[in-house]
Structure formats: structure tokens, C-alpha cells
């Protein structure tokens, strides 16, 4: 008997095992986030940076103001200290050859001149002919005159237009201040001696008295340490 080959086609399911294909990639928005999320994140970062800059700027400004205030305070303290050392009221002092009388310095001339020339000489010394305010000042001035026979011009003459005795500062004589011996007339000027007050012709050559204010001498007084 002829053996007949029998062929059978086996259609066995092939087991390909696990899928060899690469896993599908994750969605892009899982890693990178949505556009709104990215915008919010950037905005937050920008806000934080801006806040840091503002805080830093404020800190610098405050520090600068504090330093400026400290410097100004130190400057004020130094100036006040200088004022204490140089600007405290000091003694009052007259120039050499001048004599002190109250708050005035007086210079008694040793030469003679007419009244107008005497007035000009005092002006060159940054002073004026003597102005006497009251009887008490007159007496104190006369006490400084050593010789009874010597006369001295003062800053008082007769104003013909106003028919009155007028001081060189523009004020008029109070009749109670000086008891004048002599006439009140044109070209009359006043002189004083150790004992009296006289009206003389302004052209008469006699001595004169200049006056100036006392000069303050600033003493250095150092502040307590």
C-alpha cells in the first residue's frame, strides 16, 4: 500500500511576546505644562524679582538717609563745638593809646586843630568826635582830662538853619545835659575842659577827643570733654 504523505498546515498562533514597539511618548503638556501655567510661572518669577529689587532699593535708600543724617548731625555738633570755642562773648578791649569809658574807647589828641580838621582826623581813625549822652558821661570824661587849662573839641556845633546845638549824628542837644558857657551863634562849636563846657569859634585850634565802640575779643573756651 502506497504510503501517502499527508501534509498538514498548522496555523498555530505565533506568540510574539510582549510588544517590542517603544512605548508611546508622554503628552507634551505633562512635562511642560499648559501655556497658562507657563505664563503664570513666568509672571510669578518676574514679580519675585521685582519685589527683591524694590526691597534692595529701599534698603539702600534707608541706609543712605541714615548715613546722611549721621553726617549732618556730626557737622552740626562740630560747628556747635567750634562756636563754643570761638564765639562766646569775650572781653571788650580798646586799641592801644585809647582809654576805656563804659562801652566806649576815647582818644585824647596831643596836637591842636580847628573843629573841622579834628572831625576829619577822627574819621581817618574809624571813629568820630566825642558824643556825650548825659551829665554822668560828661563827668567821667572830664575826670580823664589831666590838665585844667586844656580844652578839647567834641562832636557838637551850632546849626544856624535850625538855630540849635546839633550833634554830628544828627540829634539835637538836650538842654539839661550840658551847661554851655558862651554864645549860641554861627560858627560856634563846643569844647570841654576838666571842669566846664564852652562855646568856641570853630576855627580855634585846640585839642580834640575821638570815640569808637569797644571791640569784642573772642576768647577760646573749649567745651567740656
Swiss-Prot record:
GO (cellular component) term, any one: plasma membrane
Induction trigger: By IL12/interleukin-12 in NK cells.
Residue positions the entry lists as glycosylated: 157
SMART domains, per database record: CLECT
An example Gene Ontology biological process: regulation of natural killer cell mediated cytotoxicity
Assembly and oligomerization: Homodimer; disulfide-linked. Interacts with acid sphingomyelinase/SMPD1.
Protein name, UniProt field: Killer cell lectin-like receptor subfamily B member 1
Native organism: Homo sapiens
